[in-house]
């Protein structure tokens, strides 16, 4: 029995694809690390879908290879990528999302990737990553997501923090507690349970963070009085 298992292990090693490691460098500073796999039938003359898998809280860019996502990608002729996101507890803050965006761009510059077929998947903290990235990146001139799947993903960071009586990782990366910087918790969440009408900020890619915050605050003030305004109008 042991001999058979050992043989199967050797076969799996022989059949597995090479995993490459790359570093995201901006202005001579190493910002992040990510790994990727090229399918065995890769053809640079045709475009290939890209599957991005995100690690769970406490994981890293290699954690996703303990799943079957990489194998499924290889079987389908898809390129597979797994980002670190700057830290093992990043909770998909804006900086981590920017890293992922730049890593996708690097992959597009170095491999023939179908920009209309970029998919994201993950579990727990990583399960929400694709949904959060999709919500925050709607500029058609930059990498967008065609579809995303979440396994037990953390959907509402504000609710999660409240239920945990605070979350040190979120405080670290969002810049404060849920009641101090609610905007950061909302835009780094997949949804906002309290009111689905407020679930996502309006994505205006050319506004800076300050403008985003003003817009978010204005929307939150206006939403409760819209029904009254509608009722009073002739």
Where would I find each of the regions flagged by the language model?
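Alpha/beta-hydrolase active-site loop
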Residues: 91-111
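Primarily recognizes the serine-hydrolase "nucleophile elbow" in alpha/beta-hydrolase
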Residues: 109-110, 116-166
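Mobile cap/lid helix-loop segments that gate and shape the active-site cleft of serine hydrolases
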Residues: 153, 158-208
């Amino acid at each position: 029995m042991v001999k058979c298992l050992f043989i199967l292990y050797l076969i799996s090693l022989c059949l597995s694809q090479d995993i490459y490691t790359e570093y995201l460098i901006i202005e001579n500073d190493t910002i992040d690390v990510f790994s990727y796999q090229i399918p065995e039938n890769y053809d640079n003359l045709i475009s290939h879908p890209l599957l991005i898998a995100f690690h769970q809280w406490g994981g890293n860019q290699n954690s996703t290879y303990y799943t079957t996502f990489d194998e499924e990608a290889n079987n389908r002729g898809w390129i597979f990528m797994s980002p670190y996101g700057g830290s093992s507890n990043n909770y998909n803050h804006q900086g981590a999302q920017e890293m992922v965006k730049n890593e996708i761009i690097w992959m597009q510059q170095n491999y023939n990737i179908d920009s209309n077929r970029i998919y994201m998947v993950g579990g727990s903290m990583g399960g929400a990553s694709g949904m959060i990235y999709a919500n925050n990146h709607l500029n058609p001139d930059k990498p967008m997501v065609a579809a995303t799947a979440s396994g037990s993903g953390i959907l509402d960071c504000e609710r999660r923090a409240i239920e945990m009586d605070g979350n040190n990782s979120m405080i670290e990366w969002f810049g404060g507690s849920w009641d101090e910087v609610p905007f950061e918790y909302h835009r780094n969440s997949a949804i906002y349970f309290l009111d689905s009408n407020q679930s996502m900020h309006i994505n205006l890619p050319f506004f800076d963070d300050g403008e985003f915050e003003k817009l978010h605050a204005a929307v939150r003030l206006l939403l409760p009085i819209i029904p009254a305004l509608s009722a009073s109008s002739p």
